[in-house]
């Protein structure tokens, strides 16, 4: 296993994993673990760098990859965070935004599956309509939100905020992305599981990838996971915790992209990281969810299944 240093941002995390893999003889790492303290919006400069290389190699852009994990274009952020004592009118607005996201995506899922690479479904489709074959499946994400809200309500009514974790310090639950009975030798979803844990009132995510393609997918994956993370924090009222990714194999794609091109990308990315100004992060989901979300709500979220 290769645990990397704790990162402050998804930008640092992406560059750190790519750099570590690039320095390996074959450009691949086994069992990489990277953690981000404060997952927030990506650096536009790094998105542009990644997009430039993706366009040259004929791959989907970063935002399209991110939309497969969380389609921000389909979520009309209400600018509210769940609280057990929030007014009924505000709760109704928050609930409406959540339900609109689910219904909009589930309605579009059959059409999305006709797009290139989506024949076996999309990541977000499996979250809101398991197993993701159509729009009538089991909504894992909605169930987890309701469970977490119920947890917040019970703790709020029985203890004060300072004592919330005294009786039961850890609550965890997962979101499935992979069917264990799926015997396809190829075409597996690379993202197989998302674990949700609450410790000390902080909601953290762990995403498990079988194969993590560091040029083609990883940065977009991190952006999408961050959007999902902030959505969960906003809809449940928990503080934003750590985002962690465990990749069975992390691949710098030096054979497909070329080692020279990856090295050039890393040089430019490290320059951008070194030159960036201080970047603020939000204590909960609201501020960053707005920045992470697209302004064009309602359009079909393009994406591929991996």
Set out the residue ranges of the language-model regions:
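Terminal, non-catalytic protein-protein interaction segments that mediate quaternary/complex assembly
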Residues: 1-306
